[in-house]
């Protein structure tokens, strides 16, 4: 594990006070509100000296809303870029409209596929579909494809067994999915199913996904599969989806949304996605670089807040991150091994915390790695990040 973090975490648990403000100092600090720019910039973050390891809390607060509007439709990353949008972080809808040209696919998290009985399937969540928003995104970004996430929800083991063992069930499932895509003017789907099924049924799942892809491709629709990391976090063991499965599905599917985040746990706090682990996940999947362009390296636009006293963690999105920087003005530290920033702060009654959240530098390093490996990226999710992140894409 990361030596620097071990030292920090020991200090948190033992109650070190060397970086804690006195009450009088805290009152003085609170009286000086940190400023936030509300206007666009005529230069991207790369030209403003902001993509650095030595960042300051006040600079993040000041600059995070200020993106380069004149280049909002220009791409800096040549590979595939998939961006997820969720109804519970609605700012992502605006991000997709403003920066849509920087993406090849946008995936709204709207839909669930449910089995209602023998050869009976239903896609729920259609009440969340926003046709006006879809038209607006495509109006400003001509080449972008709208591919909603389709989650296999409330499936029992018997549901999977009955479907995977029946060609008629698979055909009916594929028809249902293709028909909804046609009716709703979707360009395909991001399918999330792999992590919900035990490994002994993966042969049948590959068979089903192959048939589903054939049906959707006949309708000129895309199929992207969400896959877990190929290397289990914190170990050298292979994950649930490895080179064996990738080799079978890569010629058939259009992409793979690789979940290279959530590396650390509340029991072992640390970085969200260490760089060496990300690299290993890609290399294990495709060691010969045959299908690398179909791998979409997962980038988290959220962070984690670890509480030392409670042995717990909570996700952190952009607004909370900025507010924490305002309230505590912490010293932000660069972990060179993981290539991520983190900081420590203390709540009045809640004990000590450490926060890992993406920064311009950590994202730039990962985009450079994606270029080196020849892969695309997938972002979870657009409503959780800071606006100036998109200058990098």
Swiss-Prot record:
Database matches in PROSITE patterns: GH18_2 (PS51910)
Organism of this sequence: Mus musculus
GO cellular component: a single term: extracellular space
GO molecular function term, any single one: chitin binding
Subcellular localization, as worded in the UniProt entry: Secreted; Lysosome
Listed transmembrane segments: none
Keywords from the UniProt entry: Immunity, Innate immunity, Lysosome, Secreted, Signal
SUPFAM superfamilies for this protein: (Trans)glycosidases
Subunit structure: Interacts with STAB1.
Pfam families: Glyco_hydro_18
GO biological process: carbohydrate metabolic process; innate immune response; negative regulation of cytokine production involved in inflammatory response
Function: Saccharide- and LPS-binding protein with possible roles in pathogen sensing and endotoxin neutralization. Ligand-binding specificity relates to the length of the oligosaccharides, with preference for chitotetraose (in vitro).
Signal peptide start-end: 1-19
Family, similarity comment: Belongs to the glycosyl hydrolase 18 family.
Gene3D superfamilies linked to this entry: 3,6-anhydro-alpha-l-galactosidase, 3.10.50.10, Glycosidases
Start and end residues of each GH18 domain: 79-393
Source superkingdom: Eukaryota
Stated name of the protein: Chitinase domain-containing protein 1
